[in-house]
């Protein structure tokens, strides 16, 4: 709902915040279309009619299908994904709506070899980070904000520290999800769906990591930010947007 941004967004959902003349979600949809994605499912919650009004169908974005999560006030992002699951018939890309990022993030995920992958970045220092913990497939040195691209198996995803594990990167909010993984996530959600249910999709991925191999892909120098509070918004304007439009 973007409560921490209410002084900026007013009644606008976060995904409709404008940067460089485009809303966050429209920019993402353009990126998707440029990568050959022809259909997108948009799950709405707060002020869902605003999305319908803003996202008029045109040739620059994929064909849109809107799904409204009626219990958005009492649920986290996993329930939004659960609501959309009946409309997903093939492996898909999962994108959070409050992201400002460079376009190479998408082909990095799309071209990853394997049905599932969670995109990670190097250290951003933006605050409110969600960390991906895991083990590297290959022995490599260097800190997580290096320019290297690294892949590995996820051991956990959390804001909380795991002293026994190593931080491999920060969760970006862009993933490639197979129907097989989606079904397992939804099965877990059914078991834990007493309302209010504020768990997010990445928590279910984290839960499943002990039972199945789910990889991360870290692009150490990826330019991006989520926009979840005032400091994120200011960082997006002053640091991220200028690097995207230079």
Give residue ranges: language-model regions.
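N-terminal nucleotide-binding beta1-loop-alpha1 segment
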Residues: 1-10
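Conserved core of the sugar-phosphate nucleotidyltransferase
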Residues: 102-194
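Conserved alpha/beta core of the MobA/IspD/sugar-nucleotide pyrophosphorylase nucleotidyltransferase superfamily
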Residues: 168-246
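Conserved N-terminal catalytic core of the sugar/cofactor nucleotidyltransferase
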Residues: 22-92, 193-195
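Conserved beta-strand segments of alpha/beta enzyme cores
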Residues: 15, 63-65, 153, 213-215
């Amino acid at each position: 709902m973007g409560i921490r941004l209410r002084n900026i967004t007013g009644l606008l959902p976060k995904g409709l915040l404008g940067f460089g003349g485009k809303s966050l979600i429209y920019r993402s949809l353009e990126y998707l279309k440029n990568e050959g994605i022809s259909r997108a499912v948009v799950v709405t919650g707060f002020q869902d009619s605003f999305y319908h009004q803003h996202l008029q169908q045109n040739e620059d974005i994929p064909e849109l299908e809107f799904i409204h999560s009626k219990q958005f006030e009492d649920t986290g992002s996993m329930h939004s994904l659960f609501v959309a699951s009946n409309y997903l018939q093939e492996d898909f890309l999962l994108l959070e709506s409050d992201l400002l990022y460079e376009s190479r993030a998408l082909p990095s995920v799309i071209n990853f070899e394997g049905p599932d992958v969670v995109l990670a970045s190097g250290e951003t220092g933006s605050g409110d980070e969600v960390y991906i913990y895991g083990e590297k497939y290959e022995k490599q040195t260097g800190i997580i904000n290096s320019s290297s691209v690294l892949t590995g198996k996820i051991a956990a995803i959390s804001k909380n520290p795991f002293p026994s594990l190593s931080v491999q990167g920060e969760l970006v909010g862009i993933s490639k999800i197979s129907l097989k993984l989606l079904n397992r996530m939804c099965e877990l959600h059914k078991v834990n769906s007493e309302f209010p249910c504020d768990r997010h999709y990445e928590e279910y991925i984290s839960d499943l990591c002990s039972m199945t191999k789910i990889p991360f892909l870290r692009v150490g120098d990826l330019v991006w930010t989520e926009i979840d509070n005032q400091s994120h918004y200011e960082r997006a304007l002053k640091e991220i947007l200028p690097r995207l439009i230079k």
